[in-house]
């Protein structure tokens, strides 16, 4: 997989932990990087590539991760990278073709507290929304 370089938003664009109304450090830690490898002869290899990388969110105490499904479809290897740099292999547990979401089960202990699932129905006009990707720091 390609090496990632450390980049960050300028300080004025970063959220202030004391002002967001939730545990920002916990939210950042619950977002992991997923890297996957798909065989060259895979059905989706030509259109989606054989090396894929994206984000996932830990949603259960056992480390279960929800992600976008294309990252894991046909994957023969998955690596999970935590915010503190640990790398654990993962197993593609499920892919839902209707929603496009996938589930990855780590094959080792992540030691990350899961995020609590919310409801989009509770989000209103003018509410603040935060988009968090792997690598954020509080």
Enumerate the language-model features and the residues they cover.
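Conserved active-site neighborhood of the chymotrypsin/trypsin-like protease fold
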Residues: 10, 39-41, 53, 60-138
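A short, Trp-centered hydrophobic/proline-enriched beta-strand micro-motif
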Residues: 26-47, 131
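N-terminal targeting leaders that route proteins to membranes or the secretory/organellar pathways
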Residues: 1-30, 51, 64
């Amino acid at each position: 997989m390609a090496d990632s370089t450390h980049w960050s938003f300028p300080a004025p664009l970063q959220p202030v932990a004391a002002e967001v109304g939730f545990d920002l450090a916990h939210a950042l830690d619950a977002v992991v990087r997923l890297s996957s490898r798909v065989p060259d002869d895979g059905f989706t290899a030509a259109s989606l590539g054989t090396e894929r990388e994206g984000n996932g969110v830990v949603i259960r105490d056992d480390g279960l991760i929800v992600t976008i499904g294309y990252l894991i479809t046909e994957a023969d290897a998955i690596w999970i990278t935590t915010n503190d740099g640990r790398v654990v292999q993962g197993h593609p547990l499920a892919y839902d073709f209707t929603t496009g979401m996938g589930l990855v089960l780590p094959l080792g202990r992540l030691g990350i507290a899961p995020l609590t699932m919310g409801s989009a129905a509770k989000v209103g006009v003018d509410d603040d929304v935060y988009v968090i990707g792997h690598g954020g720091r509080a």
